[in-house]
């Protein structure tokens, strides 16, 4: 069966790579890199254990996932990033700290989630500062849309958390709309909008750059809630008129 090509959310640019990063990609990849073969990945075999597991998509230079993996050796961390200099930098950090709980994939995250990761694989998924594609004609390239959020929700275990952040307001509003609309996600914000920056997330270079440009930062947090999804489905079937009113109210609240 032919799978339609998706619009990529990234452009591979020839970024400057240091000699150390080049060596890391050659020498450290066998220890930390994950090769994509046929079929879904066996994450328990890759990490050599069954432990709480987090995924970071688009980790940049590894500021967040590197810190978390160092601080929480009892948890396993999988990072996905397409830009090789950032991958090399994280591999160097992992080797210096002798991390045993970190693995890296250098590939398109959309394809990895769709083809290589089993549903219910993660306790936490992080997507911080994806490319905002700020020009309107490029909005179709944005990573966070309804289809991708549905994939993220599927990869979470029940009760698992999804966290996102951006420094572009209209992208934050798009994230909010699609996440609030997903039937498997329940907002961790009391008013179904944004949450404070979590303490565990250090300010990234993208965040610092945005602050210098006068941008705000918007954090979002959700939990996977199969119970909420089932209740909403039952309520919609029993009260179709009330459900339509609820949806309209939600749209107004989400601005």
Residue ranges and their predicted role:
Residues 1-55, 63-70, 91-120:
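S-adenosyl-L-methionine
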Residues 83:
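Conserved SAM/SAH-binding beta-strand->alpha-helix loop
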Residues 144-158:
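A short glycine-rich, Lys/Arg-flanked "PGG" loop and its adjoining helix->strand segment in the class I
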Residues 158-166:
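Conserved beta-strand signature within the Rossmann-like core of class I S-adenosyl-L-methionine
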Residues 60:
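Conserved glycine-rich SAM-binding loop
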Residues 173-255:
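Class I S-adenosyl-L-methionine
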Residues 57, 80:
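Conserved beta-strand/loop positions that form the S-adenosyl-L-methionine
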């Amino acid at each position: 069966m032919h799978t339609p090509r998706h619009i990529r959310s990234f452009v591979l640019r020839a970024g400057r790579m240091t000699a150390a990063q080049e060596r890391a990609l050659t020498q450290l990849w066998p220890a930390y890199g994950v090769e994509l073969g046929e079929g879904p990945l066996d994450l328990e075999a890759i990490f050599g254990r069954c432990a709480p597991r987090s995924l970071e998509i688009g980790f940049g230079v590894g500021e967040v996932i590197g810190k978390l993996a160092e601080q929480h050796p009892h948890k396993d961390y999988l990072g996905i990033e397409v830009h090789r200099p950032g991958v090399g930098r994280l591999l160097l950090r992992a080797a210096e700290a002798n991390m045993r709980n970190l693995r890296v994939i250098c590939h398109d995250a959309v394809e990895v989630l769709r083809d290589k990761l089993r549903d219910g694989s993660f306790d936490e998924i992080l997507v911080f500062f994806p490319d905002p594609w700020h020009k309107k004609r490029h909005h179709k390239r944005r990573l966070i849309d309804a289809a991708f959020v549905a994939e993220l929700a599927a990869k979470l275990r029940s009760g698992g958390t999804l966290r996102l952040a951006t420094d572009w307001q209209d992208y934050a509003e798009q994230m909010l709309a699609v996440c609030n609309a997903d039937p498997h996600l329940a907002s961790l914000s009391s008013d179904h909008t944004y949450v404070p920056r979590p303490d565990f997330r250090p300010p990234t270079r993208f965040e610092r750059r945005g602050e210098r440009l006068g941008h705000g930062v918007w954090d979002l947090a959700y939990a996977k809630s199969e119970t909420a999804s089932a209740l909403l489905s039952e309520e919609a079937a029993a009260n179709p008129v009330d459900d339509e009113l609820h949806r309209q109210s939600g749209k107004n609240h989400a601005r």
